[in-house]
């Protein structure tokens, strides 16, 4: 089953935790999100190659459908959230007929973009069913359970980093205001700029294949043990090119002429994509995670970009 799924994902190298989490995992889950929940389990249990290939192809189709639905909901949710402000203690959005199978994914995207707890709610038949994602230090599940006990929400619960809720449509605004207040009491306020945890400063010549291999052996990583995030300070952008409509491929280096490749997914959903694309040789602080890229039998290190800061020109 996994071999058939890897073929559909065009994965031709030994899978890493990243591949499992971001290539194979979403395809296995696609059945539960927009199709039949048992498809992934049937694929993994299949001992017949023909059956496995058929199930993998079906999951690939459903995953494509899931992405299309997700992109539509994501665009609308981001528009709403940006109008309210991505610097609020809680970032949230709600819409009619938003597919329940993608609201959690969209909430994750909002959380990553804002670095705030985020909730996305799909409205249907007078009720809103939503999913939330949190950040370190904010117990979203407990906050939602608090609102259930107060009678603000019909039901809800979860854990520190993720939770679900059900609320009457006419109560959504009030419920989100109360949830935002609870989160603010825990230490997030709308005047505090979002922060990004950084583990170490690194120079391009230290970003070796051996280093990345050692980091991979220390995994797998997750919410409780995130993969290390490095800063490359005062780097000059050498090359930048848009990949598709949303992503950015680039390379950067220091004065010692050591050049490293980078990739920024969904870069053009913020100012990062356009700013780096139109770099004109300017210098940036770059923050992200290191990974191995394999292409045509060649292995190299690349930076998966999380954030960037343009260095302001210094006065002479």
Regions found by a protein language model. Give the residues of each.
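Hydrophobic helix-and-loop "lid/oligomerization" segment in the mid-to-C-terminal part
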Residues: 1-171, 242
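Mid-to-C-terminal polyanion-binding domains and interfaces
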Residues: 51-93, 138, 146-316
